[in-house]
């Protein structure tokens, strides 16, 4: 990555001894790009590029779900996976306050607080997985098991 500043997510991956590579993609400064476009711009299969979604449960606790960019979160399955009656996506305006990240640059690693995190079980079928590194324009790629460990996450079937 050269002299590019490391993000909190990158520092945590290094601290946890997770081997990763950083990959930049073209974007307009500060403008979020959808995940399928990110995958295409990096020449990667969207099945191995994951997005980080933040929800709030009926208990008012926050939960993080990480799913393939082309998939849709099954809110009922997601709620079941964390023992909640229901979960709902948080409003875009709350993302930075809750996570410390911006929309389009939200990483499952290195949020302000450690929220309960669940990856869709499809991640276990991938050789490598890409997630945001905490800023728009850069993704990190690493082995799924290492990423799950660094994010202190579980896996469950949470997509349709």
What is each PLM-predicted segment?
Residues 1-160:
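Extended, low-hydrophobicity, polar/charged segments
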């Amino acid at each position: 990555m050269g002299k590019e500043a490391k993000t909190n997510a990158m520092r945590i991956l290094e601290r946890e001894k997770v081997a990763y590579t950083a990959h930049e993609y073209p974007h307009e400064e500060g403008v979020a790009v959808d995940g399928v476009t990110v995958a295409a711009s990096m020449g990667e299969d969207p099945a191995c590029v994951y997005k980080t979604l933040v929800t709030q449960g009926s208990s008012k606790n926050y939960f993080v779900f990480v799913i393939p960019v082309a998939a849709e979160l099954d809110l009922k399955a997601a709620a079941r996976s964390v023992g909640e009656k229901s979960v709902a996506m948080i409003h875009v305006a709350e993302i930075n306050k809750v996570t410390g990240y911006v929309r389009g640059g939200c990483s499952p690693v290195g949020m302000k607080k450690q929220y309960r995190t669940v990856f869709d079980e499809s991640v276990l079928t991938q050789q490598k997985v890409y997630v945001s590194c905490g800023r728009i324009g850069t993704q990190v790629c690493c082995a799924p098991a290492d990423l799950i460990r660094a994010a202190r996450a579980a896996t469950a079937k949470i997509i349709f």
